[in-house]
């Protein structure tokens, strides 16, 4: 009997992030929604993380599923996010999705932008 090893996911989603996305999708009353994570130019460090809901999975997108929630990342953004993790935090500074990114060499003080 041979076992097939599962390839590690290129990016992780924490339980907190999956639970928040599930709650937001329920509020929107559209079970087709997926969390799209992307990178754009901007911010004080050069690149910014972006989060939006999308009903589509585009050709070439990487799909990560956790607890019934789907996260999609386009190929261009994925190259900057490999090995990272998407989380959801609540604190004195507010609540937000965050990315732990081992590829970032520097980040800004608020953590919303980074450079490589």
From Swiss-Prot:
The keyword Plastid does not apply. The gene is erpA. It holds the Pfam family Fe-S_biosyn. InterPro entries: FeS_biogenesis (IPR000361), FeS_cluster_insertion (IPR016092), FeS_cluster_insertion_CS (IPR017870), FeS_cluster_insertion_RrpA (IPR023063), HesB-like_dom_sf (IPR035903). PROSITE patterns: HESB. Homodimer. The keyword Electron transport does not apply. One of its GO terms (molecular function) is iron ion binding. Binds 1 iron-sulfur cluster per subunit. GO terms for cellular component: cytosol. It comes from the Bacteria. Its cofactor is iron-sulfur cluster. Required for insertion of 4Fe-4S clusters for at least IspG. This is Iron-sulfur cluster insertion protein ErpA. HAMAP family: Fe_S_insert_ErpA. Iron-sulfur cluster binds at residues 44, 108, 110. GO terms for biological process: iron-sulfur cluster assembly. Keywords: Iron, Iron-sulfur, Metal-binding. Belongs to the HesB/IscA family.
